[in-house]
Each structure stands twice: as structure tokens, then as C-alpha cells.
Amino acid sequence: MIRSIFKKNSSLPYFLKRSFITKPHSIITPIINNNNHNNNNINTPIKNIQSFNFKFFTTTTTSNPIHQQTTTTTTTTPSTEQQQLSKEAEEINENITKYNITLTDSCVKELNSVQKKSDSTDIFLRVMVDMGGCSGYQYIIKVENKLQDDDVLFIRNGAKVIIDKISLEMMEGSIIDYETALMRSSFVVASNPNTIKSCGCKISFELKK
């Protein structure tokens, strides 16, 4: 395209014609030789065209292949309520490990059923040891909706069992179950390694000395 501008009869010198036959992206910058150009006479025509030196500069755009990536790390601080729930869960796990209290599947199922039928979401099965019965001690098992200060909480799949600390000294390692019988269905302490014997009703027992 640039070649077509300069015809054979053009009055421009030949070297100028060649100067314009360059790459399309070249920039032609004339450098005036101050020795041949009189700055005092601006209107004087430049006769010696060879006093112009032409330099060609090519503009190149270089892209950096390395792109810096900014990684934003979001740190979420648990709320006070979440921290409290987490702390309670840790305490419950410690209780299960420390006292080795087992809640059977039937116990969990029945206790969850009782909780669904109740208006309160806080339903606990209290198991405690009291003096009495035919063997000297007896279990008292009942459903409550309040925790006492000395209660230790055990939870499995939503079922909550509470045992006071004094009773736990005589019940460590016990298994709490729900038994269904023809005459009577109830929560029972199915096994207690701290006892010597228990009566057939599984309510009264004798402790090891």
C-alpha cells in the first residue's frame, strides 16, 4: 500500500522513497543536523536534503508472563454460642470416655420418642442411686427437664441421660437400656460392673466392698 503512494515521476529523492518502505508498525523520526540548519532563518528552504538523518524505531509491547495473584484468606471467628456448644460437646465426649457409660440403641430410640411427644426440647433421663430395696441400694430412673449443678450429661444421637456425680461413683461402666416385656416396659440399668448381685427386677442391687 505504501509503495503505491510514490510513483516513478515523484520529485522526492530515491532514498526517501526507500525510507518509507518499511514495516507498517515502524515510526520514522527525522533527526535534524544542526550544523546544516540555520535556526535564525526559519523561512530559508532546506536545499541539502541529505542533512536529514532518518532513524527508524519499532515499538514492541512485551507482556509479563508472570501474573501476581492475590490470595484472600478469610478467617471466621466462631460466635460465643458456637464456642459454648463446642465446649459442651468436648465435655460430653470426655464424660463418655471417663465414666464409660453406654446407652443402647433401644434406650436412644425410646428416649428420642419421649422427647418428640413432649413440648419441651430438653428432655433428660435421670438415673440415680439411692439406699433401699431388698439388696441395700436401688436405682431411681425418671424423665426430667432440668439439670442440677452436680449432674453429668451423656448424649448419644440426641438422647440425653444425666447422672449425678455421687451416683456415678457406683455406676461407672454401666449400660443403660430400654427393655420391652409383656407386663412392663421400662428404662433399666442392664449391667453395672460395680455390683455383686441384683434382684430380678433390675432395680435393687448390692455393691462390691
From Swiss-Prot:
GO-annotated molecular function: 2 iron, 2 sulfur cluster binding; 4 iron, 4 sulfur cluster binding; iron ion binding
Which GO biological process categories is it annotated with?
iron-sulfur cluster assembly
One GO cellular component this record assigns the protein to is:
mitochondrion
Where's the transit peptide in this chain? 1-27
Q: Is Nucleotide-binding included in the keywords of this UniProt record?
A: no
Binding sites annotated in the UniProt record for Fe cation: C134, C199, C201
Subcellular location, record wording: Mitochondrion
Q: Which InterPro entries does this chain map to? A: FeS_biogenesis, FeS_cluster_insertion, HesB-like_dom_sf
Q: Which UniProt keywords apply?
A: Iron, Iron-sulfur, Metal-binding, Mitochondrion, Transit peptide
* Cofactor(s) annotated in UniProt: Fe cation
How does the cofactor bind to this protein, according to its record?
A: Binds 2 iron ions per dimer.
Which superkingdom does the taxonomy of this entry point to? Answer: Eukaryota
PANTHER family, sorted: IRON-SULFUR CLUSTER ASSEMBLY 2 HOMOLOG, MITOCHONDRIAL
The UniProt family comment states: Belongs to the HesB/IscA family.
The record ties this protein, via NCBIfam families, to: iron-sulfur cluster assembly accessory protein (TIGR00049)
The free-text function statement in the UniProt record for this protein reads: Involved in the maturation of mitochondrial 4Fe-4S proteins functioning late in the iron-sulfur cluster assembly pathway. May be involved in the binding of an intermediate of Fe/S cluster assembly.
What protein does this entry describe? Iron-sulfur cluster assembly 2 homolog, mitochondrial
Q: Which organism is it from?
A: Dictyostelium discoideum (Social amoeba)
